[in-house]
Amino acid sequence: MSLIRLGLALLLLLATVSQLLQPVQGRRKMCGEALIQALDVICVNGFTRRVRRSSASKDARVRDLIRKLQQPDEDIEQETETGRLKQKHTDADTEKGVPPAVGSGRKLRRHRRRIAHECCKEGCTYDDILDYCA
């Protein structure tokens, strides 16, 4: 009887130690609405520039953002090529004194795609999401 109690105590100790050694919160895969909600909760100052609008337009913005987050890689590559062409045009404009606004916007859009890829495909941690906050 004492041997059974000793075995159960060791089993309980082993289970407790194994739970303590696991990371508290590892990488979690979040896509679409779940990713947007995580960004809203974690990013106090927002993850994009926000303008208060009516709830109908907010729903439209959420749907648009979800569509962009779920956009296939081929579309992303095509937009990147288009962005490069715009960037060349912007470089010529810079010589004339026009600020390079097109390239800046392109960089911001690609940044949002990276968090979608990172969190949806590979999983991300709290610290990863915090890096994308404004």
From Swiss-Prot:
Any one of the GO BP annotations: insulin receptor signaling pathway
Domain of life assignment: Eukaryota
Localization (cell): Secreted
Gene this chain is encoded by: Ilp4
Assembly and oligomerization: Heterodimer of a B chain and an A chain linked by two disulfide bonds.
A family per Pfam: Insulin
GO MF assignments: hormone activity; insulin receptor binding
Biological source species: Drosophila melanogaster (Fruit fly)
Protein name as catalogued: Insulin-like peptide 4
Disulfide bridge positions per record: C31-C120, C43-C133, C119-C124
Family the UniProt entry places it in: Belongs to the insulin family.
Biological role stated in the UniProt entry: Possible ligand of InR/insulin-like receptor.
Coiled-coil annotated spans: none
Key words of the record: Cleavage on pair of basic residues, Disulfide bond, Secreted, Signal
Signal peptide: 1-26
PROSITE patterns per UniProt: INSULIN
Biased composition (Basic and acidic residues): 81-96
